């Protein structure tokens, strides 16, 4: 199976949109749904809430979709979404989550309350377009994630990591689980003792062959594959 560099990941996304005529909301819904299924496979529902940290881009959109589906699966998601966008897609995703009774807040939770109130953290802050360093407005939540003892599930890229080189310093988060989308990125080779899943079951065979992705086979109707 091929691990993608940043430009390859961007190019594949562009081909999905332009050559194969997928819409952003189509792929986001499929990606977020697969993330919810991975979390349901790896972590049983608990009384504690799931803190889902969403960034301003498509990675954050995946998190908003996952929150909605997790609520339908009897989990208790709580969304931290500090930097909003005026794009209709993201406004709709937020509205859908809130309409289902999910709290979506701009208030950064403090470390102590996170440890007391939550049982799991989903990191949907930055995707494969990210280039360090982390912007100042996201430093508070990154500090919470770096210090937390709770398991962290990262969507596609552990936030703060270089997409190709992985963690840049010893303070970067180390997720307990990574959900790679479409295909793993090079940074996934730097995971330490983490569960690794592949989600996003939407890659056309012709596109897979063009980039020599050699994706693993999905079992039956599953939306994910466990890679380790």
UniProtKB/Swiss-Prot annotation:
NCBIfam families (UniProt xref): yjeF_nterm (TIGR00197)
Keywords attached to this entry: Isomerase, Metal-binding, NAD, NADP, Nucleotide-binding, Potassium
The keyword Metal-binding belongs to this UniProt entry's keyword annotation: yes
* Record keyword rRNA-binding present: no
InterPro entries per UniProt: YjeF_N_dom, YjeF_N_dom_sf, YJEFN_prot_NAXE-like
Its catalytic activity? (6R)-NADHX = (6S)-NADHX; (6R)-NADPHX = (6S)-NADPHX
Its required cofactor(s), as named, are: K(+)
What is the role of this chain? Catalyzes the epimerization of the S- and R-forms of NAD(P)HX, a damaged form of NAD(P)H that is a result of enzymatic or heat-dependent hydration. This is a prerequisite for the S-specific NAD(P)H-hydrate dehydratase to allow the repair of both epimers of NAD(P)HX.
Pfam families recorded: YjeF_N (PF03853)
Per the UniProt entry, what species is this protein from, by scientific name?
Anopheles darlingi (Mosquito)
**Name of the protein described by the UniProt record:** NAD(P)H-hydrate epimerase
Q: Which cellular component, as a GO term, is one annotated location?
A: mitochondrion
Q: Which family does it belong to?
A: Belongs to the NnrE/AIBP family.
Textual note on the cofactor: Binds 1 potassium ion per subunit.
Q: Any idea of its EC number?
A: 5.1.99.6
Positions annotated to bind (6S)-NADPHX: 58-62, 127-133, 156
Which residues bind K(+) per the record?
59, 123, 159
Q: Which residues form the YjeF N-terminal domain?
A: 9-215
- EC top class, in one word? isomerase
GO molecular function (one): nucleotide binding
């Amino acid at each position: 199976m091929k691990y993608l560099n940043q430009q390859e990941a961007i190019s594949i996304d562009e081909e999905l949109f332009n050559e194969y005529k997928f819409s952003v909301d189509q792929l986001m819904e499929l990606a977020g749904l697969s993330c919810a299924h991975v979390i349901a496979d790896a972590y049983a529902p608990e009384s504690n809430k799931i803190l889902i940290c969403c960034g301003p881009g498509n990675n954050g959109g995946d998190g908003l979709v996952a929150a909605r589906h997790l609520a339908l699966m009897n989990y208790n998601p709580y969304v931290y979404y500090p930097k909003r966008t005026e794009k209709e897609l993201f406004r709709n995703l937020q509205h859908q989550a809130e309409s289902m009774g999910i709290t979506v807040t701009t208030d950064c939770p403090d470390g102590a309350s996170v440890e007391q109130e939550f049982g799991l953290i989903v990191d949907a802050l930055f995707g494969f377009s990210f280039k360090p360093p982390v912007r100042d407005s996201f430093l508070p939540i990154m500090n919470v994630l770096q210090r937390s003892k709770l398991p962290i599930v990262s969507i596609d890229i552990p936030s703060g990591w270089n997409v190709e080189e992985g963690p840049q310093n010893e303070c970067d988060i180390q997720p307990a689980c990574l959900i790679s989308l479409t295909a793993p990125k090079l940074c996934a080779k730097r995971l330490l003792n983490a569960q690794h899943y592949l989600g996003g079951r939407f890659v056309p065979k012709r596109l897979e062959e063009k980039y020599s992705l050699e994706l693993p086979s999905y079992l039956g109707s599953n939306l994910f594959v466990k890679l380790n």
